[in-house]
Amino acid sequence: MSNTVNEYSTERKAFIITGPTSGIGRCTALELARHGTVVLVGRDPRKLYLVQKTIEGKGGHAVSVICDVSDLTSVRHAAAEIIALKLPLAGLVNNAGVLAMQATKNAQGWDTAFATNHLGPFVLTEALMPHLPDGANVVFVCSGVEDPERRPAVVAGFRGGRYISAEASARGEWKSGGSTLPGADAYATSKQCNLATVTAFARETPRLRFNAVEPGFSPATGLGRDANVFVRFLGKHVLSLFAPYIKYWSTPERAAKVITNAVLNGAGVTGIYYDERGKPMLGSEQVRDPKFQDRIVAETRALLAKTPM
């Protein structure tokens, strides 16, 4: 299902974003709408409608495509729907993500967090790549928690990516010695896979630009939507007030500007990982290894090839 806007101009560039209905994704969608048509990809029709109407109310253009990014069949259908719109695509933002407090399975029987954060964006990106023009920007919203040496992540209880293999991750299995925080290993590992994918794709497909953004810790975002009411209230109404003044922290609005700048960047840069201030940063030692990057991409493709969708 799609909901196209009236009076669409084929001269306007179009930008695709997943997870556009709250937090960083919503702010980024509103930023991108200042520069072209925004394809809003999300699972909740009502929330998509509200964001689309907000964009249109500001004089922008938007298209809504319903998709559960954790369901790979849904992702395939969404990609086909986007392609069928025949919009002048200029960029893709893989923003949808989840930090699940409890492990669950997706429609294919795989770990939902790993499917949402890595497999879904991987499938969507590969499906759309042939339809993106030379120089188009693909941005993955990543996270520094994949790095076991990143101090704020360690203080928060993360222990870095715990990758064994794509199949093990799909089963919800992680390398021993990880975090005691519920969902932390799944989140960190999936985000490490995101970053590895960005750098591998940047080498594989030089006609496109692949970059990553660490948006900073934003207490008001929806990543922890499975957390209890008190934790969600604390993040949204208390901690978010201090975010602009703390290193490694940010706000959805500030993160949106960094992401939008990466999408609009016409300098031809690729394979860059930006921090919450828009400055280049390094990922973990492991994820910087080209062999590790290629392994994750190869194993992900092999896993997907065996899966009926």
Model-predicted segments: where are they?
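C-terminal amphipathic/interface module of NAD(P)-dependent oxidoreductases
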Residues: 284-309
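Active-site oxyanion-binding pockets that recognize sulfate/phosphate
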Residues: 107, 184-187, 245, 286, ...
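A generic "alpha-helical surface" signal
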Residues: 46, 73, 253, 291-294
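Short aromatic-enriched loop/helix-cap "lid" or pocket-rim segments at secondary-structure transitions
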Residues: 150-154, 222-227, 285-286
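C-terminal helical subdomain
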Residues: 239-281, 290-292, 302
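Alpha-helical membrane-targeting segments
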Residues: 160, 175-184, 217-254
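Rossmann-fold NAD(P)H-dependent dehydrogenase/reductase core
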Residues: 2-219, 307-309
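A generic structural signal for short coil/turn motifs at secondary-structure boundaries
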Residues: 101-102, 282-285
